[in-house]
Design a protein with these regions (language model features):
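Cytochrome P450 I-helix active-site segment
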Residues: 7-59, 74, 80-82
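Hydrophobic, well-ordered secondary-structure elements that form the walls
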Residues: 53, 78-81, 120, 151, ...
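Short, small-residue alpha-helix embedded
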Residues: 1-6, 168
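Conserved cytochrome P450 K-helix/beta-meander segment immediately N-terminal to the heme-binding cysteine loop
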Residues: 87-135
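Active-site-adjacent bridging/hinge elements
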Residues: 133-147
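C-terminal helix/juxtamembrane-tail motif
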Residues: 196-209
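Cytochrome P450 heme-binding "Cys pocket" and the immediately downstream C-terminal segment
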Residues: 9-13, 150-154, 158-196
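A structural signal for well-ordered alpha-helical segments within the folded catalytic domains
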Residues: 44-51, 142-146, 163-170
């Protein structure tokens, strides 16, 4: 998440501006925002940045499910009882994506332009709204992504993870400017285990004020 901020300074500055507009009292008093301020204020671009970080970085390499009935997935027949390995990291940034002709007609999420699926672009999670300030609101269903899986067996720590990610990102971007590290310390290489972890976890900071 912090690596994406360093690699995309325009996104980082847009987020910092959104945070300062959301917490004018904290800015005027030159202090960090409180937990109540962080989680009691609707900031669509903050939520969008967290979600885009999860989409691009990935949390798990895959998950496993057993088919409880005969079905067809992307044109392939899957008989009941089959163990299905679902790749969580890849489909959301795949270029080109799976052909639309084999996709399910009952999709519950929107679709994105396949040409920029590999680009870190938080605004893809913002949708028009007639009631939200600025005319945009965050939507978790804006596109295809499931970093914590779905259904009854989805990650039970999902809510805590979002709480922590929102807190950490807000506080770091509020207080610091994340600058790009040297290439050898800022690769996208990762190690897969229980979770998908970056191989290099270095940051370069300067004060934001």
């Amino acid at each position: 998440m912090l690596k994406f901020m360093a690699d995309n300074p325009q996104v980082q500055q847009r987020l910092r501006t959104a945070l300062r507009e959301a917490w004018p009292a904290a800015l005027a008093e030159q202090r960090i925002p409180t937990v109540n301020e962080i989680h009691g204020t609707v900031i669509p671009f903050l939520d969008a940045t967290v979600e885009e970080s999860l989409r691009c970085a990935g949390t798990l390499p895959n998950t496993v499910r057993d088919a409880i009935r005969d079905t067809t997935l992307l044109g392939h027949f899957v008989p009941k009882g089959t163990t299905v390995f679902l790749t969580l990291y890849g489909p959301g940034i795949l270029v080109p994506p799976f052909p639309e002709t084999i996709a399910d007609d009952t999709e519950k999420v929107a679709d994105w332009d396949p040409e920029d699926m590999h680009v870190f672009k938080p605004e893809r999670w913002l949708v028009p709204s007639s009631t939200a300030p600025g005319g945009l609101e965050f939507s978790v269903n804006a596109g295809p992504s499931m970093p914590f899986s779905l259904g009854l067996r989805s990650c039970f720590g999902k809510r805590m993870a979002y709480y922590q990610l929102r807190t950490v990102l807000a506080l770091v971007v509020w207080r610091f400017v994340l600058e790009k590290c040297p290439e050898e310390l800022s690769t996208s290489q990762a190690v897969d285990g229980v979770t998908h972890r970056p191989k290099h976890s270095y940051v370069k900071l300067s004060t934001a004020y």
